[in-house]
Amino acid sequence: DKIIEGYFDGEQMIATTGQAYAVPANYASKSKLVVGDSLKLTIGPRGRFIYKQVNPVERRRLVASLEQAPDGNYYAVHKHQRWRLLKASVSYFRAQPGDRIAIVLPRDLPANFAALENLIAE
């Protein structure tokens, strides 16, 4: 097995070599990965990719509003800030634009992406 370490950038793992590896959106969504989380990728002898979160960064939580941009991407909006969300997370929660959502962000790192933690029922 080949083992590669890196960090999550919101969509993919960036290895210490600088190479990017696609992280399955369902894994990132289910694991609530945030920008900066350390990941380990094991590539099996038959090409199977297995990701594992090895060192999560400190997190903070916010309540935001869900918006959908004209290009189809989803964003969490809080005051004058916005963070992109994985479509897999929005689909899983069956969230709709205008819904109030709970998001998770890295506490001490700038981020363009947020993890969708939950849908807040009105």
Question: What do the PLM-derived regions correspond to, one by one?
Answer:
Residues D1-L33, S38, R48-P106, A114, ...:
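S1/OB-fold single-stranded RNA-binding interface
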Residues T42:
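Short metal-binding segments enriched for Cys and/or His
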Residues I120-E122:
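Short acidic DE-rich linear segments
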